[in-house]
Amino acid sequence: MNTDLAGLGPDVVLEDTSIQRTVRRGDGEVHRWQKDGDYHVQVLHWAVSDRNDWERIKTRHLAADDPSRFPPDWEAEVERLRARDYPLQLIHWGVYGFARTLMGDEALAFAFYDDPGLVHDILDTYTTLALHIWERMTAVLDFDLIECWEDMAYRSGCLISPATFRHFLQPQYRRIRAFADAHRIPIVLVDSDGYIEPLTALMLESGVNALYPFEVQSGNDVASMLHTHPMLGALGGLDKRVMSQGRTAMDVELERAHTLIRIGRFIPGPDHFVLSDVTYANYAYFMRGLRQVVMETRPGS
């Protein structure tokens, strides 16, 4: 189900060389994609630079009743999902995150002050769209969690202040939590890279009750967070870099997973995507070891 922009049409390739490709998307974004390395995309022109851009996207690409949002075999998919033996989630492309993907971090940071009405409209319009689509989905299926993609922090700290979060983001998160409660969905999970601790208490106040991936190199301390916030669930939290540092480093991190699981409310995993300097042998060793840790360790043990 598409809870993002709809009806974009095909990308237009502006340049294609042996090392990079430059593409214009249907929403107007132009980005350069590097063909090697771990971090590939550089945005050259954002889709929204002013209110006119936003009105164009809002009118053309954010219709909740666009038939392309649901697959043609939706009814068959529903029957398949009703028989599942795994958790099922609803996707929200972020309160901050959705605006960020349209405007970029810098322009959005200015817009919070220079055009707050525009920011409120983007955030409110997108969450209204998501809730509308979710209503149709929850009418025929039960869901276990709602995941919100945010990425509102880097290694050195958060991209927004607590005051900005409270004023702009909190009202939308409370709408999401109200929807979750009304449909007996217990978990609202936020995905944000970087050092997210300064916003954690506000997220919990707003209805979020689980976070991931708790990047280690950004300074996140999962154990401290779990002890400080007894209603918080955590996922990730294991340093992905150890998979390129050898078995001794991996064993130390796996032992740390034991300790964190014992605290409770924690599902261990790499704290970001695995980088290209990791061999398959090292990856397999770490993941097999992690599986054993998970199967053998219980909260409170």
Language-model region placement:
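Glycine-centered secondary-structure boundary/capping sites
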Residues: 1-2, 19, 28, 153
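Generic structural signal for short, solvent-exposed loop/turn connectors between secondary structure elements
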Residues: 1, 17-19, 230, 245-246
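Active-site loop segments of alpha/beta catalytic cores
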Residues: 24, 51, 56-301
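A contiguous, low-structure linker/loop signature
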Residues: 9-64, 83-84
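Segments that shape or occlude catalytic/ligand-binding pockets
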Residues: 1-11
